[in-house]
Amino acid sequence: MVDLEQLGQQAQQASYTLGLLSTAQKNQVLTAMATALTSHQDEILAANAQDLENPQVPVKFVDRLRLTADRIQDMAIGLKQVVSLPDPIGNVDRAWRNEAGLMIAKERVPLGVIGMIFEARPNVTVDASALCFKTGNAVILRGGKEALHSNQALVQVLRGALRAEAVDENAIQLITDTSHATAAKFMQLTDYVDVLIPRGSARLIQTVLAKATVPVIETGAGNCHVYVDKDAQLQMATDIVINGKVQRPSVCNATEKLLIHREVAADYLPSMIQALREQGVEVRGDAATQAIVPDVVPATDADWGTEYNDLIIAVKVVDSEAAAITHINRYNTQHSEAIVTDNYQAGKLFQQRVNAACVYINASTRFTDGFEFGFGAEIGISTQKLHARGPMGLAELTSYKYVIDGNGQIRH
């Protein structure tokens, strides 16, 4: 079994030194990491091939797991983009002088040691390492067993870049024991880990929430909806739904449910469902949908709360916008929701009343992404309200402290 106490101690010690690095020093290391990824591409791809050869890898994980030369190049580009982003560490959010003459400033600081728990996504290894390093945080990575060889190769490359730049390589560490027992112990490493960020399925996230004693930032399972209002441009709605469902069905910002106002359902659903089927999507529908398109798969109650991560969508006809909002707030995961409408008031009501991190008018749910929001690479998409919500970039990986300058004041 991996010595988690030792990993934690090493990460904590590394975090102390990271906090002292200048922005220029951090950017130099990140640039070295980008160069190392491309120069070690063959080793990374060979390790990834070992993971892909495992017959136990679920089919729906293969796209997430697969690395190619282009994807490694994208990782390197992502690292360089993090270099170009402003460093939040040391920024002063607010400063003022109090009545006693003390100068008080609220200053951005690293969180410390961040624990990442994720599944078959090797890109998370690089994204998380880059964002944590830029913000002066050490990171301990615990990926899924499906991606173990890929993660080991990537971490070896990143740690090599740290060593080459004379930075403590324990700023980035990987837990190679993928057993549930070790994961459970990691979730309770409160002496060393300041926050856990799980990325993966709803089951993984719920397991972390149930077992962790380390504080958790809950990231998104994505049971995302598109509601087509009675005042929608229907071709626009079709384009948005197809993009949200088909472009990358395995990701958390993919569209999983389609709600349609009853006034346009009869005219619109046949063409919408045909367009989905042409893209290989299995369509499940409620009774009203079945009445319009009889050969859809009947939807069950379980469908409304399910994140498929696959080419499957469930369709429901609703009587009003209010009914759509009620349904969404009951079944969603507070990730990303969209309305298609030309009615300004309807759109704004939807944005006001839907409980989600990201609420769209006339746009695909697929835009919930750190790069698309201009944050650079994201470490995850938070679906909770405390500390961070939505795509988590650099700023969300910081805390703050108050620094107070005086000249001998005592309190009376």
UniProtKB/Swiss-Prot annotation:
- Pathway this chain belongs to: Amino-acid biosynthesis; L-proline biosynthesis; L-glutamate 5-semialdehyde from L-glutamate: step 2/2
Compartments reported by the entry = Cytoplasm
Reaction equations catalysed:
L-glutamate 5-semialdehyde + phosphate + NADP(+) = L-glutamyl 5-phosphate + NADPH + H(+)
Q: Its family?
A: Belongs to the gamma-glutamyl phosphate reductase family.
**GO CC terms for this protein?**
cytoplasm
Quote the protein name from its UniProt record: Gamma-glutamyl phosphate reductase
Q: Which GO terms describe its biological process?
A: L-proline biosynthetic process
So which domain of life are we looking at?
Answer: Bacteria
Q: What is its main location?
A: cytoplasm
